[in-house]
A protein has these predicted regions:
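Hydrophobic transmembrane alpha-helices and immediately adjacent juxtamembrane helices
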Residues: 2-320
Length: 320
């Protein structure tokens, strides 16, 4: 028999008589426990399984626009669009009424200056509705380009924290402009009723013209937004570019007013769209050549903008 002395929880010694075999078991058990504790301390993470490292980054080629990825984030697109609509009229007294006041006030000013004082011909169309029909697609385009051009910089907190297709941000800014376009279109319906403008089959072209305007706004806005991330001068130059584009488009005058400049005017994609709007609303003959050139220019702008955006997208989170 061996005498084994142990220490109780209260700190006092306890003496117990055990056999030699029992003492050996106690010693071996204590040694195994000490070895186990030592091994656990030396390798604390040995029991954790290795996990693969997943890196999420944009594609290296612009061809892989990954429409499936864009479709997977469609709910985020709806959220961003609705956010832009709410933020645009947040803390305003008139709210969405500004979507109507802006084109209406512009129409009144243009009617007084260019319609009454300058006497610009309008091909037999009353100047107020002539000007409003040109302002409607133009204001949608210009506001969409301006808002989408600043959209990436304004959403820097999202870009630096969460992965999602960056194209959704400028696209949502353009989609929010469609809401304003729909509100302002109600005034055009009232003007058509007031001036007794008859309905023709040309109105069936309106959805196609709205689509062309939307695609052009997405192309230009997407390119400007990507440039604005790297070169912040874009936000100062963009209003000036929009202003020059306004006067080079047949908004306050018909395209027939610039007979000597028709070859250059037709290269402006908004010229074909605006004249197409008037032809659809007033039952005039379409200038299919101008519409065809506008469609071709829009396609070129859209493809080039997508290429530039995909190429610069990889550095957005680093420089924004």
């Amino acid at each position: 028999m061996k005498r084994v002395t142990t220490r109780s929880l209260e700190g006092g010694p306890e003496v117990a008589n055990v056999s030699e075999e029992g003492a050996g078991v106690l010693q071996s058990s204590a040694g195994a426990q000490a070895a186990s504790d030592s091994k656990a301390e030396s390798t604390p993470h040995a029991a954790l399984p290795d996990k693969p490292l997943v890196t999420i980054e944009p594609s290296r080629t612009w061809v892989a626009l990954n429409l499936r990825d864009l479709w997977a984030y469609r709910e985020l697109f709806y959220f961003l669009t609705w956010r832009d609509v709410k933020v645009r009229y947040k803390q305003t007294l008139l709210g969405a009424a500004w979507a109507i006041l802006q084109p209406v006030c512009s129409m009144i000013i243009f009617t007084l200056i260019f319609g009454r004082l300058a006497g610009i011909p309008t091909d037999g169309i009353p100047y107020p509705i002539f000007a409003y029909a040109g302002l409607l697609p133009w204001l949608f385009f210009s506001n969409a380009v301006t808002n989408s051009g600043n959209s990436l910089v304004g959403s820097s907190h999202l870009i630096t924290k969460v992965y999602f297709p960056r194209m959704l941000i400028p696209g949502a800014a353009v989609a929010a402009g469609l809401v304003e376009f729909g509100i302002a279109f109600t005034v055009l319906i009232g003007l058509m009723l007031y001036y007794h403008v008859g309905l023709t089959l040309n109105l069936l072209m309106l959805p196609a013209l709205v689509l062309m305007t939307t695609l052009l706004a997405i192309g230009v806005g997407m390119w400007m937004s990507a440039l604005n991330v790297k070169y912040r001068d874009v936000r100062f130059a963009l209003p000036f570019i929009i202003q020059l584009w306004f006067f080079s488009s047949p908004i306050i005058y018909p395209s027939s007013f610039l007979k000597k400049w028709q070859a250059l005017l037709i290269l402006n994609p908004m010229a074909g769209i605006i004249e197409g709007f008037r032809s659809a609303l007033f039952g005039k003959a379409f200038n299919w050549t101008a519409l065809g050139v506008s469609a071709l220019v829009i396609l070129i702008v859209l493809v080039y903008s997508a290429y530039s955006f995909r190429r610069m997208e990889k550095s957005f989170a680093d420089v924004i």
